[in-house]
Amino acid sequence: MSAVLCRILSIALLVCAGAGVAAAEAKAVTNSIGMKLVRVEPGAFLMGQDGPAADYNVKKHAEKFDDADWDEKPAHRVTIRAAFSIGATEVTLAQYRQFQPKHAGGRGSDDDAVTGVSWNDALAFCEWLSKKEKRTYRLPTEAEWEYACRAGTTTLFHTGDALPESFHQWPADIGLRDRFFPEDKLPQEYRPKSARLSLRVAQTPANAWGLFEMHGNVSEWCADWYGPYEAGEQTDPLGRSDGDFRVIRGGSHSMQTRLLRSANRTAWLPETTSEKTGFRVVLGEWPRGKMLSPALPALNAQNVSQTIPKLQMPSPDMPFFSGPKPFVIIPPNSSGPLYSWHNHSPAIAECPNGDLLAVWYSCVDEAGTELNNLASRLRLGAGEWEPASPFWDGADINDHAPKLWWDGDRTLFHFARGQLENIVRTSTDNGATWTKAQAIQPMSEIGNGIIRTREGVIVMTQDTTSTSLTLSRDGGKTWTFTPITDKKLMHRSGSPARHAGIHAPIVQLADGRLMTIGRLNTEAEQAKFNMKTPASFSSDGGVTWTHEPTPFPAISSVQRAVLMRLRSDSVPGAPGPLLLCSFTDISANAKKPTGMDFPCEGGTLHGAGLFAALSFDEGKTWPVRRLITPGGAPHTVSGIDRGQFTLSATSAEPPGYLAATQTRDGRVQLISSKNHYVFNLAWLKQLPPAPKK
C-alpha cells in the first residue's frame, strides 16, 4: 500500500470515527472518580480470526501482520445479550491512585494509563470501586472486550485492515525492535524511532463506539481464564472455569503490529505485573452465560499411570547402549501449537511411575511470541516416544527454556523463564496435573540441571549476570538468590562472584564444594580458558567462585553440556563418578571438526561429535572418554531442526542442547535437541573396537 493511499485511508477513518464518537458521547457517563464509561448495546459478532495461518518468520517479514494465530481459530459467532458500559479509556494513573495512592506504575502523568498492575490488582480495584459506588464494576470478559474493540467491524483492526499512519509506538530498542527492523525507518503505522514514548490515554482516534486505545498503548487484562476456542455459536461466553493464565488483550507499545489485531490473544499469570499491561473496567452485572470446562489434557498428561513399579534391575556389569531415537515427533509443516521449524532446549526427568517425561520449546523464531513448550512421554515398557503435545504456554509470551527435576520421592518440578519472572510448578501425580505456577526471581534462563545438596538445599544456576545461583532451603516452597551488585563482577566469563559461562550444569563434590561447567560464546571469552570449557568452584554456597579450564574443548552456540553425579555401580546408594557429556568442536566447525583422541581396543581412535567422560576423583582427571555412538558403518541420522549428521564409529552428533537423568535402573537417559540415547556405566568403561581401516 502506497504512503499516499495510507494517508487517504487514515483521513477517511478519522472522519468516520468522528461521527461514531459523537454518537457515543451522548451515551457516555462519568463516574465518581472521573472515569468516562461508554454504553455498549447488545448484539452479535464474529469472534476470532480464520484464514491463512501465520508463519511467524519475523526475520523474513517482520512487517507482516494479517495472518491468524492458531489460538484465534475457529472464528465463531458470539451473541452479547445485555448492554454494558465500558471505560472509554484504560484506567489512568490518577484514577488508580485514588485506590492505591502510593502506586508507582505508569509514566508519571495523571492521564497516563496505569501499568504495573496484576490481574489480582485490577480485580481489587473493581471491588473497591463497586463498594464505593454500590454498583458492579468488573473486568470485561474476553468476548465483551473483542466485541467492544471491533465496534461493528470485521476487519483486522477497528481502523480497517491496517492501522493509520503513526498510530503505533516503538520508540526504544526493547522487544527486539532493531532485530526485526534494522533500518532507521519503521513501517508506516509506527511513529518514528525518534518519537518519545507516551502512555497518555485518548491520544489516538477512538473507534466507532467511542473507545480509545483498543489497539496499543498498554495491553489490558480481561476477566477470563485463557483456553482454546470451541466451534459453534456462543451466547455471553465467560471463558474457561479454570486455567493457568488470565487473558490479556489489545497489545501494547513496543511490539509487532500483528499483536494488536482485534482477534489477537495474549495470556499470562494473574499475579504478575508488567509495565506494558494495564486494564479498563466494565460497569454492569456479569453476563448470564456459562463457563466452559477446562480443555482436555494433552496427550502427555492423558491416562498417566499412578502405580509405583517394581523395577527389574539389569546387571550393572553388562554394557548397555541404545539410540539414537528421536523424541521430538512433530508432523511436517506444523505451525502451532506444535512447530516443525525449531525444537530446542530440552529437559528430561524420570517420573515416580517409571515413565520418562521430556519437555522443550518449539517455535519458528527463538525470540518469537509464538514460542510454546511441548512435551513427550516414554511410558514405562514402551519402545517409542509418544508424539509431541502441548505442555505449558502463556499465549504470546516467550516462556523460554523449560527444565524438569524429580526430587526422588513424589514431586516433579517444572521451571521456565517467563515474561518478567521465572516460574516453578510441581506435580505429585507423575505429570498428569500441575500446580498453578509460582513466580520467582530473578528472571533468567535456568542452567542445565537442578540438584539437591547433601544439606537439603535445591540449587540451580542462572544465566543472568546479576546472580549465580537460585536456592530453596524448604523443599521448593520459597526461593532466594544472592544478587551481584558490583557491575565489575557482572560478566559471563566468570568473576569472583559468578560461575563462568551460561547453561551451566552443577554438581556437589565430596568435600562439599559446588562445581559447574559453562559455555562461553565468543572466541575472546574462550581464550581466557585456553579455548577449553571452563569449570568453576564455590565453597560457600555460590557466593564466591574460582575458575579453571577443563581438558575439554570449548563449546558454543547450539550446544549445551551435561555434568552430573552418577550412582555407584558397585555399592548400592553410594555416590559414583562424575559424568560429563559435551562436544569435541564448536557447532560452526561441525563440517570440518578437529575432533579428539579416544581410547579404543588396541590404542586410540580419532573421532568428533558428542562424547562422554568420567571422573573418579571429583573432576581432577577424566580417564574414561568415549564417543556416544553405537558405532558401525557410517549412516545418516536426523538432528536438530531437520539437520542431518553422519553417525559412525568415529562420528557422533555434532550440535544440540544436552540434558540427562540417571534412572533407577542405573542407566543414563541422555537427550539432545532431537535424539534420545541410553547407556550405563559398564558401556562407558568398555573400550570400543578399533575402527576398521
PLM ranges: what are they?
Residues 1-9:
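Bacterial N-terminal signal peptides that target proteins for export
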Residues 8-18:
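Bacterial N-terminal signal peptides
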Residues 22-28:
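Boundary at the C-terminal end of the N-terminal hydrophobic targeting segment
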Residues 29-105, 118-120, 216:
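A short glycine-rich, aromatic-capped structural motif
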Residues 46, 51-68, 105-262:
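Functional-site microenvironments in short loops/helix caps that host divalent-cation chemistry
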Residues 236-240, 266-273, 601, 648-649:
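Short proline/glycine-enriched turn/loop segments at secondary-structure junctions
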Residues 275-288:
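Short, structured beta-strand segments at or near domain termini in extracellular proteins/domains
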Residues 293-693:
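Asp-box/BNR beta-propeller blade signature and adjacent active/binding-site loops
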